[in-house]
Regions:
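Conserved class I S-adenosyl-L-methionine
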Residues: 156-166
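Conserved acidic residues
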Residues: 158, 181, 227
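Domain-level detector for long C-terminal conserved domains
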Residues: 188-320
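Conserved SAM-binding motif I beta-strand of class I
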Residues: 182-187
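Conserved SAM-binding loop of SAM-dependent methyltransferases across substrates and taxa
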Residues: 168-180
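Intrinsically disordered, low-complexity glycine/charged-rich regulatory or linker segments
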Residues: 1-136, 140-141, 265, 272, ...
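Glycine-rich helix-loop-beta junction characteristic of Rossmann-like nucleotide cofactor-binding loops
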Residues: 148-156
Length: 320
C-alpha cells in the first residue's frame, strides 16, 4: 500500500519565492494585478485580530454606552411621510442598530424578552403582529460586503467620506478592510463625534480616520475632493423632505466626476420619495456592477446586501 507523503512545509522566504515564480508565469501584468487583488479579497482570518473580530470588539464597546435603540436624546427622529419607510408607525417600530446587534444577537435578545418583537393587535386577545425594526447603521455583514465585494481595491491615494457617520462603523470598516489613505466621517451630533473619536483613539485608527463635527453644508470641500462617498440611510429619518432635497442637491452639485457613491437604499428609491428634486439621475450617475463576484462565503443574493448600491459620477450636476 502506498504511503501518504507529508505535505511540503515552506519557510516564508521559500513561499515568497514560489509566489514570485507564479506571478512571472502569468506574464501579463494585468493578470498579475488581478491575482494579487483576488488573494487580498479572498484570504480570510477568523480570529480576534481579523477585521471581523475587531469590528465585533468595537460593537461590544459601543453597546456599553448606548441604549439598545442606539438613538441619543439629542437626536431628533423624523418619521418619513413618503417612500418605502412611510409605514414606520412609531408605535409599532423599534430602532435596533444593526452594527451593534447582528441577527444572531437580536434573535437571542428577543427570545429572552430583552427586545420585544411583537405587539398585540387587540388587547386581551392572542392576535399579534411583528414589530418593524429600523437601523441607522450598516450591519457588519454589509460593511464586509461593501469593502470586500462591492467596491474595487481602495489604494492609499484615495479619500473616503462617510456623510452622517453616527457611530462610525463605515469608517472602521474602511480602515480595517482597505488601504484607503484618508477616511473622513462628518457628523452633526457632537455626542456621536465624541464617541467615534474615543473608538478611533482606543483602536489606533487616528493615522487615517478623522471625525469632523459639522454639517456637510459647511464642509462642501469634502464632497468636492472625496473619491468615495458613503451615504447610508443618511437623511431620511433625520430631516424633513424639503431639507433632504436641499442636501441631495448639494451632493449632486459638488461631487467630482468619477467619484464613487455607495448608497443604501438605491438612489432611485430615494429620489422617488422626494419628487421635484431637480436631480437628473440619468445624466448624473451610472450604476456599477459588483467588483468581486468571487469572494468566498459572501451571499451576494442576500436582500440585506442587495440594498447597497454603487454608482460612478459621470457628469457633476447642475440644478435650476
Amino acid at each position: 500500500m502506498a504511503s501518504m507523503l507529508p505535505p511540503v512545509m515552506l519557510t516564508l522566504p521559500e513561499a515568497q519565492e514560489e509566489f514570485h515564480d507564479l506571478l512571472r508565469k502569468l506574464r501579463d501584468p494585468h493578470n498579475q494585478r488581478k491575482l494579487i487583488d483576488w488573494i487580498k479579497y479572498n484570504w480570510r482570518e477568523d480570529d480576534e485580530e481579523s477585521p471581523e473580530g475587531i469590528l465585533r470588539s468595537i460593537a461590544t464597546d459601543i453597546r456599553l454606552h448606548l441604549p439598545i435603540e442606539a438613538v441619543l436624546p439629542s437626536e431628533k427622529i423624523i418619521v418619513p411621510t413618503s417612500g418605502e419607510n412611510s409605514d414606520c408607525d412609531p408605535k409599532y417600530t423599534r430602532h435596533v442598530d444593526s452594527f451593534l446587534y447582528d441577527n444572531e444577537l437580536l434573535h437571542e435578545l428577543t427570545a429572552k424578552g430583552v427586545i420585544e418583537s411583537h405587539y398585540c393587535v387587540q388587547c386581551g386577545s392572542t392576535k399579534t403582529k411583528s414589530l418593524t425594526f429600523i437601523s441607522h447603521s450598516a450591519s457588519r455583514a454589509q460593511i464586509a460586503y461593501m469593502y470586500n465585494v462591492l467596491l474595487p481595491p481602495l489604494d492609499d491615494d484615495k479619500v473616503l467620506l462617510d456623510v452622517g457617520s453616527r457611530l462610525g462603523p463605515i469608517l472602521y470598516g474602511a480602515y480595517l478592510y482597505t488601504n484607503v489613505g484618508k477616511i473622513y466621517g462628518i457628523e452633526i451630533n457632537g455626542e456621536l463625534c465624541r464617541m467615534q473619536r474615543e473608538i478611533v483613539m482606543k483602536y489606533g485608527f487616528q493615522d487615517r480616520i478623522e471625525i469632523i463635527d459639522s454639517s456637510i453644508e459647511k464642509r462642501t470641500d469634502l464632497l468636492a475632493t472625496a473619491d468615495i462617498i458613503v451615504l447610508n440611510n443618511v437623511f431620511e429619518f433625520f430631516m424633513e423632505p424639503n431639507e433632504q432635497i436641499k442636501m441631495w442637491k448639494l451632493i449632486y452639485e459638488r461631487v467630482k466626476k468619477k467619484a464613487l457613491l455607495v448608497t443604501c437604499p438605491a438612489l432611485d428609491v430615494t429620489m422617488e420619495s422626494l419628487p421635484d428634486n431637480g436631480i437628473d439621475m440619468d445624466k448624473w450617475v451610472q450604476e456599477l456592477d459588483v467588483y468581486n463576484m468571487d469572494a468566498p462565503d459572501m451571499p451576494t443574493d442576500d436582500p440585506e446586501l442587495k440594498m447597497i448600491h454603487l454608482y460612478e459620477v459621470i457628469n457633476p450636476g447642475k440644478t435650476d
